[in-house]
Structures are given as structure tokens and as C-alpha cells.
Amino acid sequence: MPETRTVERPGGRVVAYTSWGDPGGRPLLLVHGTPGSRLSRSPDPGLYARLDAHAVTFDRPGYGASSVHPERTILSVADDALAVADALGWDGFAVLGVSGGGPHALALGMRAPERVRALGLAVGGVPSDFIDPDDLIEINREGLRRVREEGRESLEAFLAEPAAKAASDPGGMLDAAMADAPPVDLEMLARPDVRTTIVESLREAFVNGPQGWFDDAYALTMPWGFELGDVSPSVHMWYGEADRNVPIKAVQKMASQLRVESFEILPGVGHMGWLLHEERVLRTLLDAD
């Protein structure tokens, strides 16, 4: 496993990050899903080298080796990401936000448009008020209901059981959370390379407890702190037609408020199926940089 490094943030916090691929390659910042960690990377171990990419992943606050940040917001995570880029000496870079990493990638584009040379979303999250809960898988539907009707404490109480499961049996937690996902997602999760990568990321995400997930999930359901129209870089978007984590109707509403460079709806694909197109997705961003 590659070396983990940290960058210090105000108040003595640290943000942990890991490099993959060629350190002299084209810079690519990958923003992991929810829950997740800096071990979220391609299941294809040779992909980054083939693309001449220096890919970097980082733990959002409370996940993995990054400190908890009680005041964390979508925008504060974007500032953490910029601190990682500074530590790497990156003046400009491509960014891909995956699932819950999507809003943070958009925030990064809003914060530093002069440095984000290409901005992509692969099944990236949408504003929660765009979502019809009936379009979601059970864990997301109930989590959103609790935030809307009962508040943060209820959300954390609901997530406590799957979080405990993730700490002891991340594979079991993954299976339980995705039990009512579309068949195409379950087929992807059955692939040993995909499953191993996701389970490793989940295990690391909860190594210091569940607070990272609690804070991350809550932040994603709240207003993001910026308007979609304030994101000046054009966005490349890849979404699954059958996704029940990020429903396509809500994605289309978000796209109508962004500057969209390209928007591809992947037919017959759920939340995980974008990985079938991963090399093309990353090449698009790196070649646009």
C-alpha cells in the first residue's frame, strides 16, 4: 500500500492523503464517496500508470487518518483539498468527485477555478432538496427522512448500527446497505477487484470511529454553502440511468444549473457501473487539463 502523508490544518488538525500512479504524471485529485477514505481508488492497479496520472486521494475529516473537524462543511473540505494540492506543489489539476465526493469537488471548482483545470462528477451527489426520497435505496431514504423530520441526532442514531457493522465487518455492512440496490450494482459488487477495493476503503474509513460518516452524511443533506451557478469551471458528468443512490431526475435538475461541458447518462447502469467506464472518464479529464 502506498505511503500515507499528512498536511496540517488550522487548530492542529491533519488531513491524510495518499498518492497512486506516477509521481511525475499528470495531477488528478480524486474525492471519495460516502462513507469512504483515501484508500478509495481504481480497482485496476495499472490504470493510473497507463494514463500517465499522479492520482491523489485524501480522507475527509474524521475518516481514516484525518482529524475530526466539528465545524466541517462542504466548503471547508474544499479548503482541505487545496491544502493537499499546495503540499504537492500542484498549481493546477483535474478533479473527479465520486458519489458523496461530488459536492466537495464542485465546491473546489467554486473555490479555486483558476487551479481546477478539469472538473468531473461520476455519480456525484446532488442537493438533497432536489431528491424524491421514494427514488432512493432504503438506507439513504430513511437517512434523508430523519434529517428532514427529526434532525441530526436522529440521523446519527440511525447510522450508528451500520457504522458499528462497518468497523467490524465492512463487507457485511456493504452488503446490507446495498441489499435493495439495482441488480446491475449487485453484479458490480460481486466482482472481486471492485469488492476488495471498496471493503478496504470502508475498513479504513471507520478505523477511528463513525464521526467522519456522521458529519459527512449530515453535511451532504444540508445547504452546501454555495450556489450551483457559482461554479465557474465547466463540468463533465457521468451518471447511471438506474442509479438509486443518486436518482437521475435529481441529477438532471442539478445539471440545468451548472455549466456543463458533457453529460452522459450510462444506459442500464446503477451507482457502481460507472467503473466500467472508468478509464474513459479519467482520460477525458486528464486530456482536458
List each model region and its residues.
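N-terminal cap/lid segment of alpha/beta-hydrolase-fold proteins
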Residues: 1-19
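Conserved HGGG/HGGXW glycine-rich cap/lid loop of the alpha/beta-hydrolase fold
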Residues: 13-67
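Conserved acidic catalytic loop of the alpha/beta-hydrolase fold
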Residues: 76-94
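Conserved hydrolase catalytic core segment
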Residues: 91-135
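Alpha/beta-hydrolase
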Residues: 139-226
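Short beta-strand/loop motif that positions the catalytic acidic residue
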Residues: 231, 237-239, 243
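Conserved alpha/beta-hydrolase "acid-adjacent" motif
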Residues: 244-250
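Catalytic histidine-centered segment of alpha/beta-hydrolase-like enzymes
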Residues: 245, 266-282
